[in-house]
């Protein structure tokens, strides 16, 4: 039987599980907490950044046997890291398996995906209309020779569409993906959160919606297209679903620089927010 390894990544760390071992990699913020929570288990704590502690990539390469398989849920590992793991697997004449969420299969009481309401951020706060932002991104696409732009950064989607949400408790974003061409802007989200007010706003700005789960099938249809995306942000499954005939432009999302170049309204509101935060009890 071929040895298998599974890589699991979360905001606070990365777990690697083999047939005989399990390890958790985390940084200095969580050394104490992780040590306490792993006490009495068979999981080894790897303190990232400390001397003689291998990185996740080094550990995977060292422990993967010839012809072995590296597996992970392709939706939770970014495209660049996924490509690196692919290289490691190929070195050992093995393969990558990213089609299934094995944790989800055994996590029976997993909370459902958040479906919090979406609200529109008025131009009085953003200082720039959604139509203007979309036009600017389309110009950047032309400059790069891209026909399609795939956007997976929740921060950038919220900024571009002037919308906010509560799907993540500490960040006002909406769980979604976005596909932009010169003719279309398609927002993939849970359609239950789209009320009449939001639907009217989206139609006015030339934005159509599709179900969140439909994004991966949409990506498969982009044959012979030149696609702009940031592999450090989009996940491995997105990259793997692109047709072989598609040409990928791996570059920063145009919205990243556009967000940094704040207009007077955004500067003023940011200042007010910092003042309120400073005086908060």
Predicted segments — roles?
Residues 24-25, 32-35, 80, 159-160:
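Short active-site-adjacent helix-start/loop capping segments
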Residues 3-8:
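Short, small-residue-biased leader/transition segments that mark boundaries at the very start
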Residues 10-11, 261:
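Low-complexity basic/metal-binding stretches
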């Amino acid at each position: 039987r071929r040895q298998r390894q599974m890589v699991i990544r979360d905001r606070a760390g990365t777990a690697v599980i083999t047939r005989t071992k399990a390890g958790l990699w985390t940084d200095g913020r969580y050394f104490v907490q992780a040590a306490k929570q792993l006490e009495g288990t068979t999981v080894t704590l790897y303190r990232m950044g400390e001397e003689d502690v291998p990185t996740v990539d080094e550990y995977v390469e060292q422990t993967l046997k010839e012809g072995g398989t590296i597996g992970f849920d392709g939706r939770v590992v970014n495209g660049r890291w996924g490509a690196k793991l692919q290289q490691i697997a190929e070195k050992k004449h093995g393969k990558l398996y990213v089609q299934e969420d094995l944790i989800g299969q055994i996590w029976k009481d997993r909370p459902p995906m958040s479906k919090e309401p979406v609200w529109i951020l008025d131009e009085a706060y953003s200082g720039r209309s959604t139509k203007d932002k979309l036009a600017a991104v389309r110009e950047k696409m032309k400059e790069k020779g891209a026909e399609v732009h795939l956007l997976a950064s929740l921060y950038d989607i919220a900024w571009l569409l002037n919308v906010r949400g509560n799907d993540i408790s500490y960040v006002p974003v909406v769980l979604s993906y976005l596909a932009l061409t010169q003719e279309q802007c398609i927002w993939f989200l849970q359609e239950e959160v789209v009320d009449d007010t939001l639907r009217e706003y989206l139609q006015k700005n030339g934005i159509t919606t599709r179900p969140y789960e439909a994004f991966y099938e949409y990506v498969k249809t982009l044959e012979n297209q030149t696609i702009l995306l940031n592999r450090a942000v989009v996940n491995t499954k997105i990259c793997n679903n692109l047709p072989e005939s598609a040409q990928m432009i791996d570059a920063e999302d145009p919205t990243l620089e556009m967000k940094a170049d704040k207009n007077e309204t955004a500067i003023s509101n940011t200042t007010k927010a910092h003042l309120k935060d400073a005086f908060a009890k």
